[in-house]
Amino acid sequence: MSALKYCLLVTGPAYGTQQASSAYQFAQAVVGAGHHLVSIFFYREGVLNANQLTAPASDEFDLVRAWQQLAAEQAVTLNVCVAAALRRGITDQHEAEQLNLAAANLQPGFTLSGLGALAEATLTCDRMVQF
């Protein structure tokens, strides 16, 4: 069987539900099986996975940094819905300046994107899996 291109849609926060951690475990399985993980789109509460100010206890799994590491090692694009992020207090430097906000807190490695990035991923991937 040839390698498939996967894209993920994550709608759950990094902590408090299983959605994001299940998505991360699925992403690891996809890569481990020899498939190509192309992009991950964080939407709704899923945008909280990109919050640079998340600080889990030292004995807890740091899912936010795990996403970063996965992206760096596998060249996965981490897209964050800009509208959902701004509603939840997550912004990059550009948006913070545009909106006259005090600071930016988008975790490095994540990119604020519109729904067009999700549409493109849906069209170009063999499998889109939502969590």
Curated annotation (Swiss-Prot):
Active-site residues (renumbered): 81 (cysteine persulfide intermediate)
Class of enzymatic activity (EC top level): transferase
Top-rank taxon: Bacteria
Protein location: Cytoplasm
GO cellular component terms, A-Z: cytosol; sulfurtransferase complex
EC number(s) on file: 2.8.1.-
GO biological process: tRNA wobble position uridine thiolation
Main location: cytoplasm
Subunit structure: Heterohexamer, formed by a dimer of trimers. The hexameric TusBCD complex contains 2 copies each of TusB, TusC and TusD. The TusBCD complex interacts with TusE.
Protein name: Sulfurtransferase TusD
Gene name per UniProt: tusD
